[in-house]
A protein has these predicted regions:
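Short amphipathic beta-strand/extended segments with alternating polar/hydrophobic composition
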Residues: 15-19, 93-105
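Exposed aromatic-hydrophobic patches
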Residues: 28-30, 124-127, 170-173
């Protein structure tokens, strides 16, 4: 992600996914901007002289584990119907979708270990699926026992611009 760190900017704190880059340019994914901002280019959010920070994008794998030994304590993995799930928000269809972790049992059958879409196994391993900042995830502990999570990282403690979705693009739970 590219984050605006210029405290004098109207867009201070806003994140944008880096979709491509090389030595001289960065391409940002602006598909998730507000309806009122769709005509804006990256230079609106980051005019010349704006201070920025490049932040690694959190993914299903980097947050919840890339291998069975990385998973939260007491997390149940395996086939979708017998495992615990993480729900992630899909802003395209405005709904949460479940993901499960498939361990090593099915690797010989061509199913590598990793995170899969519970509703569409054919999508393949989705361990690199991005979890956007300020978007919630839901933990569904569908098996017995208590799961324990440990997260590492930093939390912003200064005031930032909060992006609220336009009407009709939110869910109350």
């Amino acid at each position: 992600f590219l984050r605006n760190t210029d405290s004098s900017s109207t867009y201070y704190g806003r994140y944008f996914l880096i979709s491509d880059n090389n030595q001289t340019r960065v391409t940002l994914d602006l598909s998730r901007v507000a309806q009122s901002e769709t005509s804006y280019g990256a230079n609106t959010f980051f005019p010349a002289g704006t201070t920025i920070e490049v932040v690694p994008a959190p993914t299903l794998g980097s947050v919840f584990g890339r291998d069975t030994t990385d998973l939260p304590t007491n997390w149940t993995y395996g086939l979708s119907e017998n495992s615990d799930w993480i729900y992630l928000w899909d802003s395209t269809v405005k709904n949460y979708f479940p993901f499960f972790f498939l361990g090593t049992t099915y690797e010989a059958s061509g199913w590598p270990r990793g995170w899969y879409d519970s509703l569409d196994y054919s999508s393949g391993v989705l361990s690199n699926k991005v979890i956007y900042p300020d978007e919630a995830f839901i933990v569904a502990k569908r098996t017995s026992g208590t799961v324990n999570f440990e997260f590492e990282g930093t939390i912003q403690t200064n005031d930032q611009e909060l992006f609220l979705p336009e009407g009709g693009n939110q869910v109350l739970m």
